């Protein structure tokens, strides 16, 4: 068994990747990276600098100072250039811009080394859309976490309502559907399960069941000589 393990978890928006990966990272004291957040970080920079030119953003992305920390409660905190930006990355405008940034081939290429080396020399678990297919095609374990559109929309709606936001589930469902279509059809690194990924459908699983299902896959990997 390699000293540094790299776990790739891919799947559509709302499947529970972040919750599951944070829990596993905390359990094993591994590094964790939400790869979608690094695109949000680039989007935040683009909005702040009012610069949306692909080459310029790619140059900035290649040198950006970004890290994730998971606290004792299992919550992830994002830091950009030493400043916590967790809440800013969740802004709706940042999210929409991130989707545009993620479709820029030069930006995706610039961020590849960052993702591949993240957390070294620690073992690491990464979640995203193309981790197992593009970022870590040689990952020690690949998981494709998915759920029905209805289940994902329901979870996202409850999450936002829990934060005091007034949202329509129909609108959330429509946005997720649009995001799915965009992620699956983009020319560069479209969302897809790696051929050797293990699929976990969380549609009818509770949060705890989803975490334990993935944790069992990780435990099986750790038991290998």
UniProtKB/Swiss-Prot annotation:
Residues given in the record as ATP binding sites: 11-19
A cellular component annotation (GO) from this entry: cytoplasm
GO BP, sorted A to Z: pyrimidine nucleotide metabolic process
Highest taxon of the lineage: Bacteria
EC number(s) on file: 2.7.4.25
Gene3D superfamilies: P-loop containing nucleotide triphosphate hydrolases
Region (Disordered), start-end ranges: 169-195
Chief localization: cytoplasm
Biased composition (Basic and acidic residues): 169-185
InterPro entries: Cytidylate_kin (IPR003136), Cytidylate_kinase_dom (IPR011994), P-loop_NTPase (IPR027417)
UniProt KW keywords: ATP-binding, Cytoplasm, Kinase, Nucleotide-binding, Transferase
The reaction(s) this protein catalyses: CMP + ATP = CDP + ADP; dCMP + ATP = dCDP + ADP
GO MF annotations, alphabetized: ATP binding; CMP kinase activity; dCMP kinase activity
Cystine pairings recorded for this chain: none
Alphabetical list of CDD domains matching this protein: CMPK
Compartments it resides in: Cytoplasm
Record-stated family: Belongs to the cytidylate kinase family. Type 1 subfamily.
The protein's name in its UniProt record: Cytidylate kinase
């Amino acid at each position: 068994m390699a000293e540094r393990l790299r776990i790739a978890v891919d799947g559509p928006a709302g499947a529970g990747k972040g919750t599951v990966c944070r829990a596993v990272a905390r359990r094993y004291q591994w590094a964790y990276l939400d790869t979608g957040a690094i695109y949000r970080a680039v989007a935040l920079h683009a909005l702040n600098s009012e610069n949306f030119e692909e080459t310029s953003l790619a140059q900035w992305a290649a040198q950006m100072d970004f890290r994730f920390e998971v606290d004792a409660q299992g919550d992830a905190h994002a830091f950009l250039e030493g400043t916590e930006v967790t809440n800013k990355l969740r802004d709706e405008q940042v999210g929409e811009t991130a989707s545009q940034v993620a479709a820029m081939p030069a930006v995706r290429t610039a961020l590849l080394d960052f993702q591949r080396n993240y957390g070294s020399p620690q073992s690491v678990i990464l979640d995203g859309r193309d981790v197992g297919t593009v970022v870590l095609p040689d990952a020690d374990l690949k998981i494709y976490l998915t759920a029905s559109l209805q289940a994902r929309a329901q979870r996202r709606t409850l999450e936002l309502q829990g934060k005091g936001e007034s949202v329509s589930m129909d609108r959330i469902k429509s946005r997720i559907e649009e995001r799915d279509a965009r992620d699956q059809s983009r020319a560069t690194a479209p969302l897809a399960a790696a051929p050797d990924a293990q699929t976990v459908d969380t549609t009818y699983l509770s949060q705890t069941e989803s975490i334990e299902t993935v944790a069992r896959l990780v435990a099986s990997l750790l038991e290998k000589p």
